[in-house]
Amino acid sequence: MARIAGVNIPTNKRVIIALQYIHGIGPKKAEEICEKVSIPPERRVVDLTDAEVLQIRETIDRDYIVEGDLRREVAINIKRLMDLGCYRGLRHRRQLPVRGQRTHTNARTRKGKAKPIAGKKK
């Protein structure tokens, strides 16, 4: 197994798919990385040489924010919104949907399990 950005990527998959196992790299970025390193995307990870794996690793480290750094950056951005006291920050603080979804019904994922209310039975 090749280890890139602290993640063991699967060896039997194509490079473009295997790179997507890294948090912060999706289909488009995986394609960009393959272009930069000039590796055909349909090539398998098993067939990569150590030099090619090293090139991929260096490209990701140099050009992309991935894994822990990305998670940390997102958490800091959310914390900044909460400290500002803006609408989005308040929604995060109250653990409600942030992007304008309705909450009268639905939003159970964000709000958690429904809390029973006494005397509400019919």
UniProtKB/Swiss-Prot annotation:
What keywords sit in the KW lines?
Ribonucleoprotein, Ribosomal protein, RNA-binding, rRNA-binding, tRNA-binding
Q: What is its quaternary makeup? A: Part of the 30S ribosomal subunit. Forms a loose heterodimer with protein S19. Forms two bridges to the 50S subunit in the 70S ribosome.
Instruction: Please state what the protein is called.
Output: Small ribosomal subunit protein uS13
Q: Which organism is it from?
A: Beijerinckia indica subsp. indica (strain ATCC 9039 / DSM 1715 / NCIMB 8712)
**Protein family:** Belongs to the universal ribosomal protein uS13 family.
What would be an example GO MF term here? structural constituent of ribosome
The record's annotation in Pfam families points to:
Ribosomal_S13
Q: Name one GO biological process term.
A: translation
Annotated region (Disordered) at 95-122
Function field:
Located at the top of the head of the 30S subunit, it contacts several helices of the 16S rRNA. In the 70S ribosome it contacts the 23S rRNA (bridge B1a) and protein L5 of the 50S subunit (bridge B1b), connecting the 2 subunits; these bridges are implicated in subunit movement. Contacts the tRNAs in the A and P-sites.
